[in-house]
Amino acid sequence: MFLAKALLEGADRGLGEALGGLFGGGGQRREGGGRNIGGIVGGIVNFISEAAAAQYTPEPPPTQQHFTSVEASESEEVRRFRQQFTQLAGPDMEVGATDLMNILNKVLSKHKDLKTDGFSLDTCRSIVSVMDSDTTGKLGFEEFKYLWNNIKKWQCVYKQYDRDHSGSLGSSQLRGALQAAGFQLNEQLYQMIVRRYANEDGDMDFNNFISCLVRLDAMFRAFKSLDRDRDGLIQVSIKEWLQLTMYS
């Protein structure tokens, strides 16, 4: 809760069944009213083009707005993404951890070149929690779009630095990948990340790479929003500290 607020300051079973035919040869299931859920998710999956990897600097997501207020400056691509999200999210206009897990794992099924054990529900709950500005346990449109853009950018970085095409990043590749994603880390923090997210051989698979960057991005943004005088120091109470560390 505290983390999410700090960041903003500076139909589950039916979906699962529909996703079964996504990216496969089977037909797509239609929900009542003619909604083609597979097509909706497919549109979201293909929303971000496969651009070349580039330097990425973490930025705060846009502040939460009323979902029906579509700014005139929005591109046609974003409008289409918003429409697809509306149908995917359902009446509450938010996507939960289970939906996110299904979407991410279906995306992974397209990329056989990425070594991964898949995104677990616990991992997706953690991802949702650091992005959840209103503590509903779900992601609204702006939050989801921000996350999705980052995942696609980081996927490009991951593939660029997997130079031996092993599907995972070794210790010699990981440091460069983190820097290309926009994170300059000291040796102590780098070693902590390796111990937390890599395997015993020091290799990191795709889902752990994304989980690591989501957390890094969120913590950098949280610190920046709390460091109001920009002196590189923050002061928090025990209550704020517990909220910051427990709901993430």
UniProtKB/Swiss-Prot annotation:
Binding positions (Ca(2+) 4): 117, 205
Domain of life: Eukaryota
Molecular function terms from GO: calcium ion binding; calcium-dependent cysteine-type endopeptidase activity
SUPFAM superfamilies membership: EF-hand (SSF47473)
Keyword Plastid: no
Domain EF-hand: 119-152, 149-184, 185-213, 214-248
Transmembrane segments: none
PANTHER family hit by this protein: CALPAIN SMALL SUBUNIT 2 (PTHR46735:SF4), CALPAIN, SMALL SUBUNIT 1 A-RELATED (PTHR46735)
Protein name: Calpain small subunit 2
Species assigned in the record: Homo sapiens (Human)
Recorded name of the encoding gene: CAPNS2
